[in-house]
Every structure is written in structure tokens, then in C-alpha cells.
Amino acid sequence: KMNELGFEVMHVYGLTETYGHVTQCAWNDAWNEFDEEKQNEIKARQGVRYPNTEGIAVMNPETMVEVPKDGKTIGEIMIKGNVVMKGYFKDKEATSKAMDGGWFHSGDLAVMHSDGYVKIQDRSKDIIISGGENISSIEIENTLAKHPSVSIAAVVAKPDDKWGEVPCAFIEMVKDKPVTEKELISFCKETLAGFKVPKQVVFCDLPKTSTGKIQ
């Protein structure tokens, strides 16, 4: 739709603590040969290091070792450079934790592709642990967002006696395009592993901030 309107969209990534964006999904002309679905998949990545940033890496936060560039192994995005904050105001403990190992710990979980492009999978605090399996809430949200009746999706952990936690989806529907809980669960089963499929779907108007982010 954006292409039809003549807009060229580029994904960038950054945090308040890094004074602007530190990666950008710079386009490679060779990708023009790919079909639209593949191009959109690439455009969803956060990208490669921006020139004003000294270092971007995806690491195991426990060992501070970079994860394999296989597009599958999840680690935490680490950032280094003079664009990174000095620390949190009057909070030495939080500063020490965030800067452990000489890198800023973003709290964003991501994979690194073989071409050096980063793609976020989830926030570390939003990972759902179900029966010992780590589930990305973003992966489920992105799947639900592909359904024509879904306007916005938010997935959270729901306590479960058997599995500890299970995914629960909150859905804001597209006007005049009704859909049932059963239909959305079946839709998710087409592409997601069984343990990742939401066990409950709640339809509601999702609360948002003034900038449109889901609260």
C-alpha cells in the first residue's frame, strides 16, 4: 500500500538511551528480484549498524558472547558508542546493570542474520515461558495481524496450572469484519507451533497512549 502511494519506507531502530536510531534497514538492490512477501519480510528487520554508532551486537547476556548469525538463535541487542547515555539519573544500580560488560543492554531480544541484519523477536520482559518453552509474543502478534479481520493484536502471558503460562491474545477487530475466537486460533495453527497458538482470544478496544502505542 505504501509503495502504491509512492512512499519508500525504511525501518530504523533506537532507544531513548541511545539518542536516536542506531540501526537502519538499508536496502540492497539485489532484493528487488524477490517477490513482495519476501521483500516485506526483509523490510521488517531492524537492519545494520548506523554509521554514528560504534558497535551493535546480538549477544547471550549471561556470557556476553555473540550469537551465531543464523537468523534463529536469540540473544539481546547490545550497543556501544558515544551515542549511548552515561547512565540513569541518580540510579547507579540500574546504570550498572544496563552497562554490564561495557555494552548497553537494550532489553530487546533479537536474531542476527548471516548478512549482518538484526531482527527483533521480543522484549525480554514480554517472553512467555510455557512448559519450559520460550514463546515470542511479537511472533504471535505478527501472525494475528495478517488476518484481514484483525486491526491490532496484543499477546500476553496468562497463568496456567499445567504449563505455568500460556499465550492469551487481545484483539481489536477491523470494523464490519467480524471473526470468532475459533477462527483466529485455527488461523494461527496454520503457521505457528502448537504451543505458540493462543489458548484464549479476547475481543476489545485496546487502550493506547497519545502516540498510538498499546498500553
Predicted regions and their residues:
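Conserved AMP-binding/adenylate-forming
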Residues: 3-12, 16-117, 124-127, 140-141, ...
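General small-molecule cofactor/ligand-binding pocket signal
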Residues: 10, 201-204
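Residue-level detector of family-conserved "landmark" positions at structurally sensitive sites
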Residues: 12, 53, 154-155, 199
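Extracytoplasmic/periplasmic beta-strand context in beta-sandwich domains
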Residues: 22, 199-200
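AMP-binding/adenylate-forming catalytic core of the ANL superfamily
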Residues: 81, 86-87, 97, 109-196, ...
